[in-house]
Protein backbone atom coordinates (compact mmCIF):
# COMPACT_ATOMS: atom_id res chain seq x y z
CA UNK A 1 0.00 0.00 0.00
CA UNK A 2 1.34 3.46 -0.95
CA UNK A 3 2.28 5.49 2.13
CA UNK A 4 0.49 8.79 2.82
CA UNK A 5 3.09 11.43 3.71
CA UNK A 6 3.38 15.20 4.17
CA UNK A 7 5.33 17.43 1.80
CA UNK A 8 7.69 18.25 4.66
CA UNK A 9 8.74 14.58 4.83
CA UNK A 10 9.63 14.35 1.13
CA UNK A 11 13.36 14.17 1.89
CA UNK A 12 12.80 10.80 3.59
CA UNK A 13 11.13 9.32 0.50
CA UNK A 14 13.34 10.24 -2.47
CA UNK A 15 12.71 7.92 -5.46
CA UNK A 16 9.79 6.34 -3.60
CA UNK A 17 6.15 6.20 -4.62
CA UNK A 18 3.98 8.09 -2.12
CA UNK A 19 0.52 9.58 -1.65
CA UNK A 20 -0.30 13.12 -0.44
CA UNK A 21 -3.35 15.32 0.11
CA UNK A 22 -2.69 18.83 -1.21
CA UNK A 23 -4.08 22.17 -2.34
CA UNK A 24 -3.15 23.98 -5.56
CA UNK A 25 -1.57 27.43 -5.23
CA UNK A 26 -0.67 27.97 -8.91
CA UNK A 27 -0.50 26.14 -12.23
CA UNK A 28 1.20 26.49 -15.60
CA UNK A 29 1.37 24.30 -18.67
CA UNK A 30 3.73 23.80 -21.60
CA UNK A 31 1.46 21.61 -23.67
CA UNK A 32 2.31 18.07 -22.68
CA UNK A 33 3.57 18.96 -19.19
CA UNK A 34 1.56 20.59 -16.40
CA UNK A 35 3.40 22.14 -13.44
CA UNK A 36 1.35 22.29 -10.24
CA UNK A 37 2.46 24.42 -7.29
CA UNK A 38 1.26 22.54 -4.23
CA UNK A 39 0.92 23.02 -0.49
CA UNK A 40 -0.32 20.84 2.37
CA UNK A 41 0.19 23.02 5.47
CA UNK A 42 3.71 21.71 6.12
CA UNK A 43 5.54 23.06 3.05
CA UNK A 44 5.21 24.10 -0.60
CA UNK A 45 6.60 22.25 -3.60
CA UNK A 46 6.02 21.41 -7.26
CA UNK A 47 4.13 18.51 -8.78
CA UNK A 48 4.71 17.58 -12.42
CA UNK A 49 2.13 15.85 -14.62
CA UNK A 50 3.48 14.52 -17.95
CA UNK A 51 0.90 13.58 -20.56
CA UNK A 52 2.91 10.58 -21.76
CA UNK A 53 3.19 9.15 -18.21
CA UNK A 54 -0.43 9.30 -17.04
CA UNK A 55 -3.86 8.32 -18.30
CA UNK A 56 -5.87 10.83 -20.33
CA UNK A 57 -8.33 11.05 -17.43
CA UNK A 58 -5.59 12.10 -14.98
CA UNK A 59 -4.11 14.62 -17.43
CA UNK A 60 -7.52 16.22 -18.05
CA UNK A 61 -8.18 16.34 -14.31
CA UNK A 62 -4.86 18.17 -13.81
CA UNK A 63 -5.78 20.65 -16.59
CA UNK A 64 -9.11 21.36 -14.89
CA UNK A 65 -7.63 22.29 -11.51
CA UNK A 66 -8.33 25.81 -10.24
CA UNK A 67 -6.48 27.78 -7.57
CA UNK A 68 -7.02 26.27 -4.09
CA UNK A 69 -8.49 23.06 -5.49
CA UNK A 70 -8.03 20.19 -3.03
CA UNK A 71 -7.03 16.71 -4.19
CA UNK A 72 -5.04 13.55 -3.56
CA UNK A 73 -1.93 12.81 -5.58
CA UNK A 74 0.18 9.71 -6.02
CA UNK A 75 3.67 9.94 -7.45
CA UNK A 76 7.42 9.61 -7.03
CA UNK A 77 9.52 12.12 -5.08
CA UNK A 78 12.69 13.53 -6.70
CA UNK A 79 15.27 16.11 -5.67
CA UNK A 80 14.85 19.62 -7.13
CA UNK A 81 17.79 21.81 -6.17
CA UNK A 82 16.34 24.82 -8.01
CA UNK A 83 13.52 25.30 -5.50
CA UNK A 84 13.50 26.71 -1.96
CA UNK A 85 12.22 23.36 -0.75
CA UNK A 86 14.60 21.10 -2.68
CA UNK A 87 12.16 18.39 -3.85
CA UNK A 88 9.30 17.82 -6.30
CA UNK A 89 6.93 14.98 -7.18
CA UNK A 90 6.28 13.30 -10.53
CA UNK A 91 2.53 12.68 -10.38
CA UNK A 92 1.07 9.40 -11.66
CA UNK A 93 -2.46 9.66 -10.28
CA UNK A 94 -4.79 12.41 -9.06
CA UNK A 95 -8.18 12.41 -7.32
CA UNK A 96 -10.06 15.71 -6.97
CA UNK A 97 -11.90 16.48 -3.72
CA UNK A 98 -12.98 20.11 -4.35
CA UNK A 99 -12.44 22.36 -7.38
CA UNK A 100 -14.33 25.67 -7.34
CA UNK A 101 -13.85 28.94 -9.21
CA UNK A 102 -13.44 32.46 -7.88
CA UNK A 103 -10.62 32.29 -5.34
CA UNK A 104 -10.13 36.01 -4.60
CA UNK A 105 -6.37 36.12 -3.99
CA UNK A 106 -4.73 35.79 -7.39
CA UNK A 107 -1.07 35.54 -8.25
CA UNK A 108 -0.63 39.30 -8.51
CA UNK A 109 0.05 42.21 -6.18
CA UNK A 110 -2.79 43.01 -3.78
CA UNK A 111 -3.18 45.93 -1.38
CA UNK A 112 -2.79 45.40 2.36
CA UNK A 113 -6.44 46.19 3.13
CA UNK A 114 -7.62 43.66 0.54
CA UNK A 115 -5.33 40.99 1.98
CA UNK A 116 -6.46 41.73 5.55
CA UNK A 117 -10.12 41.60 4.44
CA UNK A 118 -9.30 38.13 3.14
CA UNK A 119 -6.97 37.15 5.97
CA UNK A 120 -8.83 33.83 6.41
CA UNK A 121 -7.57 32.91 2.94
CA UNK A 122 -4.33 34.90 2.87
CA UNK A 123 -3.02 32.69 5.68
CA UNK A 124 -2.62 29.95 3.04
CA UNK A 125 0.01 31.92 1.10
CA UNK A 126 3.74 31.35 1.44
CA UNK A 127 4.66 34.42 3.47
CA UNK A 128 2.02 34.00 6.21
CA UNK A 129 2.80 30.27 6.24
CA UNK A 130 6.48 30.96 6.96
CA UNK A 131 5.69 33.48 9.71
CA UNK A 132 3.21 31.16 11.46
CA UNK A 133 5.64 28.24 11.32
CA UNK A 134 8.29 30.41 12.99
CA UNK A 135 5.72 31.59 15.53
CA UNK A 136 5.00 27.95 16.36
CA UNK A 137 8.70 27.17 16.82
CA UNK A 138 9.03 30.14 19.17
CA UNK A 139 6.03 28.97 21.20
CA UNK A 140 7.45 25.45 21.52
CA UNK A 141 10.89 26.84 22.40
CA UNK A 142 9.33 28.99 25.14
CA UNK A 143 7.55 26.07 26.78
CA UNK A 144 10.63 23.82 26.46
CA UNK A 145 12.99 26.43 27.90
CA UNK A 146 10.94 27.29 30.96
CA UNK A 147 10.10 23.68 31.74
CA UNK A 148 13.82 22.85 31.67
CA UNK A 149 14.46 25.82 33.99
CA UNK A 150 11.95 24.47 36.54
CA UNK A 151 9.02 26.81 35.79
CA UNK A 152 5.38 25.79 35.59
CA UNK A 153 2.77 27.23 33.22
CA UNK A 154 0.36 29.39 35.22
CA UNK A 155 -2.88 30.82 33.83
CA UNK A 156 -3.92 34.38 34.71
CA UNK A 157 -7.50 35.63 34.25
CA UNK A 158 -8.61 37.72 31.28
CA UNK A 159 -11.27 39.71 33.21
CA UNK A 160 -9.72 42.23 35.60
CA UNK A 161 -11.32 44.31 38.36
CA UNK A 162 -8.55 46.92 38.11
CA UNK A 163 -5.68 47.87 35.83
CA UNK A 164 -2.24 46.44 36.68
CA UNK A 165 -0.43 49.68 35.85
CA UNK A 166 -3.11 52.26 36.54
CA UNK A 167 -3.38 53.02 32.85
CA UNK A 168 -6.35 54.46 30.97
CA UNK A 169 -5.74 52.26 27.92
CA UNK A 170 -8.36 49.74 29.01
CA UNK A 171 -11.19 47.90 27.30
CA UNK A 172 -14.21 48.26 29.55
CA UNK A 173 -16.61 45.32 29.84
CA UNK A 174 -19.99 45.18 31.58
CA UNK A 175 -19.65 42.29 34.01
CA UNK A 176 -23.23 41.70 35.11
CA UNK A 177 -23.80 44.70 37.44
CA UNK A 178 -20.12 45.56 37.80
CA UNK A 179 -17.34 47.10 35.77
CA UNK A 180 -14.54 44.90 34.46
CA UNK A 181 -11.62 45.32 32.10
CA UNK A 182 -9.82 43.07 29.65
CA UNK A 183 -6.38 42.12 30.91
CA UNK A 184 -3.37 44.18 29.91
CA UNK A 185 -1.00 41.85 31.74
CA UNK A 186 -1.02 38.70 33.82
CA UNK A 187 1.89 39.95 35.92
CA UNK A 188 0.19 40.65 39.26
CA UNK A 189 -1.49 37.25 39.23
CA UNK A 190 1.78 35.72 38.10
CA UNK A 191 3.41 37.10 41.25
CA UNK A 192 0.80 35.24 43.31
CA UNK A 193 1.75 32.11 41.38
CA UNK A 194 5.45 32.66 42.09
CA UNK A 195 4.78 32.90 45.82
CA UNK A 196 2.94 29.58 45.61
CA UNK A 197 5.12 27.61 43.19
CA UNK A 198 8.49 29.38 43.04
CA UNK A 199 8.87 29.98 39.30
CA UNK A 200 5.97 30.37 36.88
CA UNK A 201 5.24 31.79 33.45
CA UNK A 202 1.97 33.01 31.98
CA UNK A 203 1.41 33.00 28.23
CA UNK A 204 -1.76 34.37 26.71
CA UNK A 205 -3.62 37.22 25.01
CA UNK A 206 -3.63 40.74 26.41
CA UNK A 207 -5.56 43.84 25.37
CA UNK A 208 -4.73 47.54 25.19
CA UNK A 209 -7.02 50.28 23.91
CA UNK A 210 -4.19 52.16 22.23
CA UNK A 211 -5.42 54.54 19.55
CA UNK A 212 -2.31 53.99 17.47
CA UNK A 213 -1.88 53.01 13.84
CA UNK A 214 1.86 52.49 14.31
CA UNK A 215 3.63 49.42 12.98
CA UNK A 216 4.40 48.15 16.52
CA UNK A 217 0.90 48.35 18.03
CA UNK A 218 -2.20 46.15 18.08
CA UNK A 219 -5.18 46.13 20.42
CA UNK A 220 -4.87 42.37 21.04
CA UNK A 221 -1.52 40.63 21.34
CA UNK A 222 0.19 37.82 23.26
CA UNK A 223 2.46 38.24 26.26
CA UNK A 224 4.80 35.73 27.90
CA UNK A 225 5.38 36.75 31.53
CA UNK A 226 7.60 34.79 33.95
CA UNK A 227 7.70 35.58 37.67
CA UNK A 228 10.41 34.18 39.95
CA UNK A 229 10.45 34.07 43.77
CA UNK A 230 13.77 34.38 45.61
CA UNK A 231 15.34 36.07 42.60
CA UNK A 232 17.04 39.45 42.16
CA UNK A 233 17.17 41.52 38.99
CA UNK A 234 20.62 40.42 37.78
CA UNK A 235 19.52 36.77 37.91
CA UNK A 236 16.38 37.67 35.96
CA UNK A 237 18.50 39.32 33.26
CA UNK A 238 20.56 36.13 33.00
CA UNK A 239 17.38 34.11 32.41
CA UNK A 240 16.10 36.59 29.81
CA UNK A 241 19.39 36.38 27.92
CA UNK A 242 19.48 32.57 27.96
CA UNK A 243 15.83 32.36 26.92
CA UNK A 244 16.15 34.70 23.96
CA UNK A 245 19.37 33.01 22.81
CA UNK A 246 17.69 29.59 23.03
CA UNK A 247 14.57 30.68 21.17
CA UNK A 248 16.50 32.23 18.28
CA UNK A 249 18.73 29.16 18.09
CA UNK A 250 15.64 26.95 17.76
CA UNK A 251 14.36 29.09 14.88
CA UNK A 252 17.71 28.89 13.09
CA UNK A 253 17.82 25.10 13.54
CA UNK A 254 14.19 24.36 12.65
CA UNK A 255 13.06 27.07 10.22
CA UNK A 256 15.77 27.43 7.60
CA UNK A 257 13.18 26.86 4.85
CA UNK A 258 10.79 29.47 6.27
CA UNK A 259 13.57 32.05 6.69
CA UNK A 260 14.47 31.52 3.01
CA UNK A 261 10.83 32.13 2.02
CA UNK A 262 10.91 35.43 3.95
CA UNK A 263 14.32 36.42 2.57
CA UNK A 264 15.58 36.73 6.15
CA UNK A 265 19.37 36.58 6.49
CA UNK A 266 20.02 34.05 9.29
CA UNK A 267 23.46 35.57 9.94
CA UNK A 268 21.74 38.68 11.31
CA UNK A 269 20.19 36.49 14.03
CA UNK A 270 23.19 34.33 14.85
CA UNK A 271 24.96 36.74 17.28
CA UNK A 272 21.89 36.58 19.54
CA UNK A 273 22.45 32.84 20.08
CA UNK A 274 25.83 33.65 21.68
CA UNK A 275 24.31 35.71 24.52
CA UNK A 276 26.62 38.35 26.03
CA UNK A 277 24.02 41.14 25.77
CA UNK A 278 25.29 44.57 26.78
CA UNK A 279 23.68 45.96 29.96
CA UNK A 280 23.49 49.66 29.15
CA UNK A 281 22.51 52.00 32.01
CA UNK A 282 19.67 54.40 31.21
CA UNK A 283 22.05 57.31 31.97
CA UNK A 284 24.50 56.09 29.32
CA UNK A 285 21.72 55.56 26.80
CA UNK A 286 20.62 59.19 27.29
CA UNK A 287 24.21 60.37 26.74
CA UNK A 288 24.48 58.21 23.60
CA UNK A 289 21.38 59.83 22.14
CA UNK A 290 22.44 63.35 23.13
CA UNK A 291 25.84 62.84 21.48
CA UNK A 292 23.97 61.78 18.33
CA UNK A 293 22.18 65.15 18.38
CA UNK A 294 18.80 63.93 19.61
CA UNK A 295 16.55 66.19 21.66
CA UNK A 296 16.26 64.16 24.86
CA UNK A 297 17.04 64.73 28.53
CA UNK A 298 17.32 62.64 31.68
CA UNK A 299 13.85 61.63 32.84
CA UNK A 300 12.42 61.27 29.33
CA UNK A 301 11.19 57.92 28.10
CA UNK A 302 12.55 56.60 24.83
CA UNK A 303 10.48 56.84 21.68
CA UNK A 304 10.64 54.30 18.87
CA UNK A 305 13.28 56.33 16.94
CA UNK A 306 15.45 56.51 20.09
CA UNK A 307 15.22 52.76 20.67
CA UNK A 308 15.92 52.20 16.99
CA UNK A 309 19.08 54.28 17.11
CA UNK A 310 20.35 52.50 20.22
CA UNK A 311 19.63 49.07 18.73
CA UNK A 312 21.61 49.89 15.60
CA UNK A 313 24.77 50.28 17.69
CA UNK A 314 24.71 46.56 18.59
CA UNK A 315 24.61 43.30 16.64
CA UNK A 316 22.39 41.58 19.21
CA UNK A 317 19.75 42.58 21.77
CA UNK A 318 20.77 45.09 24.43
CA UNK A 319 19.44 45.63 27.95
CA UNK A 320 18.74 49.22 28.97
CA UNK A 321 18.80 49.08 32.77
CA UNK A 322 17.69 51.25 35.70
CA UNK A 323 15.11 53.70 34.35
CA UNK A 324 13.88 56.71 36.38
CA UNK A 325 11.02 55.94 38.75
CA UNK A 326 8.91 58.65 37.09
CA UNK A 327 8.48 56.69 33.84
CA UNK A 328 7.92 53.15 35.11
CA UNK A 329 5.07 51.45 37.05
CA UNK A 330 4.53 51.44 40.81
CA UNK A 331 5.34 47.77 41.55
CA UNK A 332 9.09 47.99 40.82
CA UNK A 333 11.82 48.00 43.46
CA UNK A 334 13.94 51.14 43.78
CA UNK A 335 17.69 50.92 43.29
CA UNK A 336 19.27 50.99 46.80
CA UNK A 337 22.22 52.91 45.33
CA UNK A 338 20.00 55.51 43.66
CA UNK A 339 16.37 55.83 44.82
CA UNK A 340 15.53 57.87 41.70
CA UNK A 341 15.89 54.67 39.68
CA UNK A 342 14.09 51.35 39.59
CA UNK A 343 15.89 48.00 39.30
CA UNK A 344 14.39 47.37 35.90
CA UNK A 345 15.37 46.69 32.31
CA UNK A 346 14.00 46.70 28.78
CA UNK A 347 15.40 44.47 26.05
CA UNK A 348 15.86 46.36 22.79
CA UNK A 349 15.93 44.20 19.66
CA UNK A 350 18.51 44.83 16.90
CA UNK A 351 17.89 46.37 13.47
CA UNK A 352 15.61 49.12 14.75
CA UNK A 353 12.86 46.89 16.16
CA UNK A 354 12.82 48.48 19.61
CA UNK A 355 11.59 47.11 22.93
CA UNK A 356 10.56 43.45 23.04
CA UNK A 357 10.99 42.64 26.78
CA UNK A 358 10.37 44.68 29.90
CA UNK A 359 11.01 43.58 33.46
CA UNK A 360 12.14 44.45 36.96
CA UNK A 361 12.77 43.29 40.46
CA UNK A 362 9.40 43.68 42.18
CA UNK A 363 9.06 45.68 45.39
CA UNK A 364 8.86 43.06 48.12
CA UNK A 365 8.31 45.25 51.18
CA UNK A 366 4.70 45.70 52.27
CA UNK A 367 4.96 49.28 53.55
CA UNK A 368 7.07 50.53 50.65
CA UNK A 369 4.74 49.00 48.05
CA UNK A 370 1.71 50.42 49.84
CA UNK A 371 3.27 53.88 49.66
CA UNK A 372 4.09 53.48 45.96
CA UNK A 373 0.51 52.44 45.20
CA UNK A 374 -0.77 55.56 46.99
CA UNK A 375 1.76 57.79 45.20
CA UNK A 376 0.55 56.37 41.87
CA UNK A 377 -2.97 57.54 42.73
CA UNK A 378 -4.43 54.03 42.78
CA UNK A 379 -7.16 52.66 45.03
CA UNK A 380 -5.51 50.71 47.86
CA UNK A 381 -8.58 48.53 48.30
CA UNK A 382 -8.22 47.21 44.74
CA UNK A 383 -4.66 46.10 45.52
CA UNK A 384 -5.05 44.70 49.02
CA UNK A 385 -4.81 41.15 47.72
CA UNK A 386 -1.57 42.13 45.93
CA UNK A 387 -0.20 43.63 49.14
CA UNK A 388 -1.04 40.36 50.91
CA UNK A 389 1.66 38.69 48.81
CA UNK A 390 4.18 40.82 50.76
CA UNK A 391 2.40 40.65 54.09
CA UNK A 392 2.41 36.86 54.25
CA UNK A 393 5.80 35.40 53.37
CA UNK A 394 7.04 38.13 51.06
CA UNK A 395 10.47 37.50 49.50
CA UNK A 396 12.71 39.14 46.89
CA UNK A 397 11.25 38.37 43.47
CA UNK A 398 11.61 39.45 39.87
CA UNK A 399 9.81 39.07 36.57
CA UNK A 400 9.54 40.25 33.00
CA UNK A 401 7.21 40.27 30.03
CA UNK A 402 7.87 39.54 26.37
CA UNK A 403 5.72 40.95 23.59
CA UNK A 404 5.40 37.81 21.48
CA UNK A 405 4.41 39.49 18.20
CA UNK A 406 7.07 42.19 18.54
CA UNK A 407 9.68 39.47 18.96
CA UNK A 408 8.31 37.57 15.96
CA UNK A 409 8.40 40.79 13.91
CA UNK A 410 12.11 41.20 14.65
CA UNK A 411 13.06 37.56 14.03
CA UNK A 412 11.12 37.49 10.74
CA UNK A 413 12.08 41.09 9.83
CA UNK A 414 8.48 42.19 9.28
CA UNK A 415 7.49 45.72 8.35
CA UNK A 416 4.37 45.63 10.54
CA UNK A 417 3.44 43.64 13.64
CA UNK A 418 0.04 42.75 12.13
CA UNK A 419 1.70 39.98 10.11
CA UNK A 420 2.93 38.25 13.28
CA UNK A 421 -0.51 37.03 14.46
CA UNK A 422 -3.11 34.99 12.54
CA UNK A 423 -5.97 37.50 12.84
CA UNK A 424 -4.73 40.99 13.82
CA UNK A 425 -6.92 43.29 15.86
CA UNK A 426 -6.12 46.92 15.10
CA UNK A 427 -7.73 50.25 15.89
CA UNK A 428 -9.59 50.10 12.57
CA UNK A 429 -9.96 46.33 12.15
CA UNK A 430 -11.93 43.61 13.95
CA UNK A 431 -12.72 41.31 11.01
CA UNK A 432 -12.40 38.63 9.85
UniProtKB/Swiss-Prot annotation:
It comes from Lactobacillus gasseri (strain ATCC 33323 / DSM 20243 / BCRC 14619 / CIP 102991 / JCM 1131 / KCTC 3163 / NCIMB 11718 / NCTC 13722 / AM63). InterPro entries: Aa-tRNA-synt_II, aa-tRNA-synth_II, aa-tRNA-synth_II/BPL/LPL, Asn-tRNA-ligase, Asp/Asn-tRNA-synth_IIb, NA-bd_OB-fold, NA-bd_OB_tRNA. It catalyses: tRNA(Asn) + L-asparagine + ATP = L-asparaginyl-tRNA(Asn) + AMP + diphosphate + H(+). It comes from the Bacteria. Belongs to the class-II aminoacyl-tRNA synthetase family. Homodimer. It is found in: Cytoplasm. CDD domains: AsnRS_cyto_like_N (cd04323), AsxRS_core (cd00776). GO terms for molecular function: asparagine-tRNA ligase activity; ATP binding; catalytic activity, acting on a protein; nucleic acid binding; transferase activity. PANTHER family: ASPARAGINE--TRNA LIGASE, MITOCHONDRIAL-RELATED, ASPARTYL/LYSYL-TRNA SYNTHETASE. The keyword Aminoacyl-tRNA synthetase applies. Coiled coil: none annotated. The keyword rRNA processing does not apply. One of its GO terms (biological process) is asparaginyl-tRNA aminoacylation. This is Asparagine--tRNA ligase. Its EC number is 6.1.1.22. Signal peptide: none annotated.
Amino acid sequence: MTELISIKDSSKHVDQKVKMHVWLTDKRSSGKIIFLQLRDGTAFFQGVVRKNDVSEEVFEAAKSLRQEASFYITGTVHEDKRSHFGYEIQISDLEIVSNNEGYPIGNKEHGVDFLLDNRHLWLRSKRPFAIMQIRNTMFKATVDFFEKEGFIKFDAPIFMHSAPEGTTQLFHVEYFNNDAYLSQSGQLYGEAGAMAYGKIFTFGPTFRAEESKGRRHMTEFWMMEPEMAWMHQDESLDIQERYLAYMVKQVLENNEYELRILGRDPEKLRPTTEGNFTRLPYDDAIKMLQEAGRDIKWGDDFGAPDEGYISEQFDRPVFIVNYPTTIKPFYMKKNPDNPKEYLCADVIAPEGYGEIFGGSEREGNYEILKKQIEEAGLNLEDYQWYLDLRKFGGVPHSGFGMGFERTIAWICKLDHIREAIPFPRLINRMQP
